[in-house]
Every structure is written in structure tokens, then in C-alpha cells.
């Protein structure tokens, strides 16, 4: 008798995606982050659903409703902090997932990569809108500053900002629509994730060597299901340590003060996972230039397939580009640090140098090093 998982129309899809999927035998733990992101998305949707049951998207009651969730709802504090810190875990996994793709040349799967870039934008916009919902000081001023950036668009900018606000400032209409979008976007993200996987399964997974692995494939289950479960346990342990012992470690104390349009916080800054982009935005004195640099800092990922000059796919056997890659990682950490610092000397110049380095490494140095490494392979020493 044929196994039902191979014949049933629905189970067949699951079987081909997670059970009998042929996977390279040599993929390392860097390939765990896809499944971890799936778990993060599930955690966020579930905790978010329960939060939405008690939250009110009105400027008068939003802050109080979050306080009510933490104080009066059964395990409300746990749900709220799992959602807030779950977002941080989501971005940690996202950055590592993208970093893995850059290191091992996974961006040569064009469709999968481009859907991934769209997903990154969708997750970032969802997180930004979610940060506005508690209606604390940093929520209000963060929303004001970031939405105001659209006013840099020539001719239609001011009208566009007022249209997004639903008035002449960030107010009740803004909060209501941000809640609506914050609720719907994770489901759009889920649909995009399915498309992302669909394109990935058309080509099969990449592997650390970047070489064709068709001759050496193993079934996804049980080998990689067990491996993924280990990753999930480690991530959930880390998340719960964060939630139960250091729930406010990654948050901003200013957000425990209700939003006050008459009182500007001394340092307006976004959540830690946006700081690198925020530093790039601030490093350019011109408003429109800053906005373009901000968008390009993420959109540059879509250019990676066109900037690949080497005959080798992965960085595994490319020492010069490897060095540049790790300099880029260090550079991103510097940008993250600068994004959280006040706009004063010496932070301004450090931010500007780090921003120039970021674009130079990706657009100029890495493609050149790829060409040099190819030439080095032809040397007969």
C-alpha cells in the first residue's frame, strides 16, 4: 500500500517540502536560520493575536491597554515580552540568514533572493509599525521622524506625509491605520515565505562549497529535522532567558512614558535592529540624500547577483573577499553603535566613514577582489 503522505493532495506538498526533500549532505548549521525564522514568525503571529485581543488602537487608551495587558491579563506580561523580544530574535535570525546568503553566494538563486529582499522590507516595515503601537514617547517621536522622511520626496512629499498621517500630525488616525497594517502584514509575509520556499525548492539548496551537490543528496527528514529541532531549542532557550530575566534589555526606557507631543526626548532612536540604517541616514547632511542612502542600504542586497565577478560561488576558497566580508560585518556593528549615539563629534565623522566603507566594500572592493582571485587561480607558482 502506498504511503498516504505521498498520495494525499495536501500531505504530498508537505512531504515534498519537509520530509522527502532532497538536501545536500554537507549543509552546516548556517542553514538552520530559515526554519528558525519560520518559528519566529509563528511565535510573533500567535503572541500578536493574543495581544490584539486586549489592545485598543486609540491615542487615549493605547498606552493604558498595554499596561493593562502586563498587569491584569493572565500571563499578559509574558505574551507582551515574548512579542517584543521575539521581534529582536526575528531580526537576529534574519541578519544571520542574509549574512549566510552573502557568504556562500546563495544570491545566485535570483528569484529566491529577490523575494527574500522583499521579505526583509516587509518585516522591517511591520516591526516599525509595531513599535508605534504602545504609544510611548519613543513610539510617537519615532513615528513622527521616520514618516517625516517621506517629505523629502520632491513635489508630492508633504501631501504624501499628511496622507499617511491621516491629518496634520501623528495622531489617532495614524495609530489606527498602523495597527491595521501591523496586523495584516505578517499574513502577507507568510504568503511571501511560501513563495520564497517554492522558488528555493525549484533549484534545491546551496551548500558551503558552492559546488553542485546533485550527486550527494540525503532526505530532509530525519537528518535535518533533528538538526533544526536542536536550533529551535537553542533559540527558544535564548529567547526565554531574555524574556524572563532581561525583558527590557533591548527596549528604550523612554517608551515607558506616555506619548507627549509637547515634549521631545533628548535622543530619538529606533529599535537596535534599525540602528545601522539610521546611522547611514544621519551620516548624510542632505535630507533627500539621507533617505536615498537609507533605502539603498537595504536595496543594495538586490544588486549582489550583478556584482558577483568570481568564477567561484562561495567565499569558502576566496581569502581576500573573505577578509572584506568580515570587515563589512565589523563595519555594520560600528554603524549599529553609531546609530545609538548622539549627533556630535566624534560620532558624526565615524558614522560618515562607516557609511562610505559599507557602500565601498559591497559596490567596489568585493567585485574587484573577485576578479583578482580569479587571476590568482591562473598563476603557476
UniProtKB/Swiss-Prot annotation:
Residues holding heme b b562: 83, 182
List GO molecular-function terms, semicolon-separated. metal ion binding; ubiquinol-cytochrome-c reductase activity
- Gene Ontology annotations of biological process type: mitochondrial electron transport, ubiquinol to cytochrome c
Write out the annotated subcellular location: Mitochondrion inner membrane
Recorded topology in the membrane: Multi-pass membrane protein
The UniProt record gives the binding positions of heme b b566 as 97, 196
Mind telling me which residue stretches traverse the membrane in this protein?
33-53, 77-98, 113-133, 178-198, 226-246, 288-308, 320-340, 347-367
Question: Under the cellular component aspect of Gene Ontology, which terms does the record hold?
Answer: mitochondrial inner membrane; respiratory chain complex III
Primary location recorded for the protein, binned into one broad class: mitochondrion
Cofactor requirements of the protein: heme b
Q: What is this protein called?
A: Cytochrome b
The species this protein belongs to is Apodemus sylvaticus
| Gene responsible for this protein | MT-CYB
